[in-house]
């Protein structure tokens, strides 16, 4: 009689050694989501939690997200990677279109990762990776590697410094280009934007009288819901002729350095910016112990210079420190 503990061909293969976790050298940002018509979000929720614990700033969109929503988030948030789970059977079309749209928006550098358990068969995985998807993980990968090693691969592959690729000039930003605005904000966050460009931004912003609205409050008080409703009403009342910029700040975790940038998931009034959308939305991690990140004044100036008629700054909820937004 065989020993029931003896492995068989059907026995899952477990990772034998714990991987050495890759701690990001640069700020790594990811958009995570479950694909359109897909309500299976348990796996992507697990992945985004592990990403966050490993020091990644995660913009989580939740489930049932279209390619345009994912791409617009990737462009405006200036991320290095996108991670999507797809269990609904349309993965071939979805991932190909995702790669195509990123390239069309000037974000071909964004690496796309995905998974769909046994729904995505090996031949489809090979075809999608040949098309431009960085990696589709299979059930066998999960058995052999384990979740930490899988996430490790994502983090290591995307640990690149986007501030090394700043625009040579601000012409595109001053014309309202969201892709350039996103990269300029990345440069400001890193303290890498050249001083002459900062001076140009500040001068361009000073020429325009743009109101800045700060939204703050305790956790769960409805800050993001209020922001979304304000966006919706401004868009309706002004027939999308008003350009709005939203800067949403969330705290960085003290342990691990990651952050869940969860305000965008509550926004229902955003439209893809390449299809007439009048809203630029950027999530920021504090990266310090303060409620308002360093460089916020120049980030607001950049949105004004890019044509924003109204700037909304939403702070994290951390006791009385919320009042710090008044100074900006």
Regions found by a protein language model. Give the residues of each.
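Non-catalytic signal-transmission and effector/linker regions of two-component phosphorelay proteins
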Residues: 1-5, 10-28
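ATP-binding Walker
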Residues: 38, 218-221
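Short beta-strand/loop segments at the ligand-binding rim of alpha/beta enzyme cores
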Residues: 27, 105-115, 306-313, 328
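Cofactor-cradling patches in redox/metallo enzymes
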Residues: 37, 44-54, 58-150
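Extreme N-terminal, non-catalytic leader segments
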Residues: 16-17, 147-211
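The Walker A (P-loop) glycine that initiates the GxxxxGKT/S ATP-binding motif of P-loop NTPases
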Residues: 34, 217, 248
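Nucleotide-state-sensitive switch-loop elements of NTP-binding domains
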Residues: 189-210, 221, 226, 230-325
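Hydrophobic anchor at the beta1->P-loop junction of P-loop NTPases
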Residues: 213-215
């Amino acid at each position: 009689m065989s020993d029931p503990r003896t492995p068989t061909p059907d026995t899952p293969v477990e990772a034998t050694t714990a991987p050495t976790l890759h701690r990001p050298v640069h700020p790594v940002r990811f958009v995570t989501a479950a694909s359109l018509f897909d309500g299976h979000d348990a796996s992507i929720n697990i992945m985004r939690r592990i990403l966050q614990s490993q020091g990644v700033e995660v913009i989580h969109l939740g489930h049932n997200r279209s390619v345009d929503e994912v791409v617009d988030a990737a462009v405006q948030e200036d991320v290095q990677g996108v991670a999507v789970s797809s269990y609904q059977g349309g993965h071939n079309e979805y991932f190909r279109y995702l790669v195509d749209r990123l390239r069309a928006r000037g974000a071909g550098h964004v690496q796309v990762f995905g998974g769909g358990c046994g729904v995505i068969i090996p031949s489809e995985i090979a075809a999608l990776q040949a098309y431009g998807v960085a990696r589709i993980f299979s059930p066998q990968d999960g058995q052999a590697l384990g979740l930490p090693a899988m996430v490790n691969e994502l983090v290591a592959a995307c640990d690149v410094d986007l501030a090394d690729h700043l625009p040579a000039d601000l012409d595109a930003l001053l014309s309202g280009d969201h892709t350039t605005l996103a990269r300029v904000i990345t440069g400001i966050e890193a303290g890498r934007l050249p001083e002459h460009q900062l001076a140009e931004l500040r001068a361009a912003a000073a020429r325009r009288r743009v109101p800045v609205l700060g939204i703050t409050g305790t956790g769960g008080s409805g800050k993001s819901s209020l922001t979304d409703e304000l966006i919706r009403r401004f868009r309706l009342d002004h027939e999308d002729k008003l350009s709005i910029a939203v800067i949403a700040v969330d705290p960085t975790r003290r342990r691990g350095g990651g952050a869940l940038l969860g305000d965008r998931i509550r926004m229902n009034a955003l439209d893809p910016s390449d299809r007439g959308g009048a809203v630029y939305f950027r999530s920021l991690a504090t990266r310090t112990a303060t409620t308002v990140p360093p460089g916020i004044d120049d980030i607001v100036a950049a949105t004004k210079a890019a044509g924003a008629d109204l700037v909304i700054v939403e702070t994290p909820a951390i006791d009385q420190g919320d009042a710090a937004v008044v100074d900006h």
